[in-house]
From Swiss-Prot:
One of its GO terms (cellular component) is peroxisome. Interacts with PEX7; The interaction with PEX7 stabilizes PEX18. Interacts with PEX13. It is found in: Cytoplasm; Peroxisome membrane. Disulfide bonds: none annotated. Involved in peroxisome biogenesis and the import of peroxisomal matrix proteins that contain the peroxisomal targeting sequence PTS2. Required for peroxisomal targeting of PEX7 and growth on oleate. It comes from Saccharomyces cerevisiae (strain ATCC 204508 / S288c). This is Peroxisomal membrane protein PEX18. Its main location: cytoplasm.
Length: 283
């Protein structure tokens, strides 16, 4: 029995296949469906770390990575808030809302601040370069100053002054200088003459006042005689009567300094000691 069951008879297999009828493919549909279901079914994961990783990736795929912000247009920026139109049939609540509408609603911040554009700010922030890096789009090396270390040689005058013209100029300057000196000398002499005459008149008046004071205030005859016999009173008397006058010494070859002193009008001799210069040094 057992041996017969284990043996395979090819004839029996052929007969059994013919009894079933022609092949329609329905027998294999179930097997194909089973294979497809196995392929579509999620794999059996025994590792917990791998399971968490796949779950996290699914969450990332489902969530949006960025928010699409609709850019603002000129219509949005120029939009003005307006209250609803007045209606006779509106309720008291609508009337109160219309009255308090400007107080309850505030305009957007871009309408309050002039020259504010949020889109420009976002665009510029995206195009900014990192710290320390700059765009080289308009870079031009010719715009930088170039230091020239060349040493220039000094050259002489291309057209030197003619020596003949130089000599004529020097001669003209020397002539002008000499004429100016002569004018200064004449002016000094004129001024000295007038001042000398004024000083002589003042000296005569002073000498007369001294003599008059001594004569009137000397009660003692002995004192009066001593004053009259002194050289000082004799000089004051000669100055007051005009016998001694002031004279200017023009100097000599040995002594070029000029002096003003008393001299006798008739003889022209100096009254008193001769003038001597004192040197500014110690012997």
């Amino acid at each position: 029995m057992n041996s017969n069951r284990c043996q395979t008879n090819e004839v029996n297999k052929f007969i059994s296949s013919t009894e079933k009828g022609p092949f329609t493919g329905r027998d294999n549909t179930l097997s194909f469906n089973k294979i497809g279901s196995r392929l579509n079914s999620p794999p059996i994961l025994k590792d917990k770390i791998e399971l968490k990783f796949l779950q996290h990736s699914e969450d990332l795929n489902q969530s949006r990575s960025y928010v699409n912000i609709r850019p603002r247009t000129l219509e949005d920026q120029s939009y003005k808030f307006e209250a609803p139109n007045l209606n006779d049939n509106e309720t008291s609540w609508a009337k109160d809302f219309r009255y308090n509408f400007p107080k309850n609603v505030e305009p957007p911040i871009e309408n309050q601040i002039a020259n504010l554009n949020i889109n420009n700010g976002l665009r510029t922030s995206q195009t900014d370069f990192p710290l320390g890096f700059y765009s080289q789009k308009n870079f031009n090396i010719a715009s930088f100053p170039v230091v020239d270390h060349q040493i220039f040689k000094t050259t002489g005058l291309e057209h030197p002054i003619n020596s003949h013209i130089d000599s004529l100029i020097n001669a003209e300057f020397s002539e002008l200088e000499a004429s100016s000196l002569e004018e200064d000398v004449h002016t000094e002499e004129e001024n000295s003459g007038t001042s000398l005459e004024d000083e002589e008149t003042a000296m005569k008046g002073l000498a007369s006042d001294i003599i008059e004071f001594c004569d009137n205030n000397s009660a003692n005859k002995d004192v009066k005689e001593r004053l009259n016999s002194s050289k000082f009173m004799g000089l004051m008397g000669s100055i007051s009567d005009g016998s001694i006058v002031l004279k200017k010494d023009n100097g000599t070859e040995r002594n070029l300094q000029k002096h003003v002193g008393f001299c006798f009008q008739n003889s022209g001799n100096w009254a008193g000691l001769e003038f001597h210069d004192v040197e500014d040094r110690i012997a």
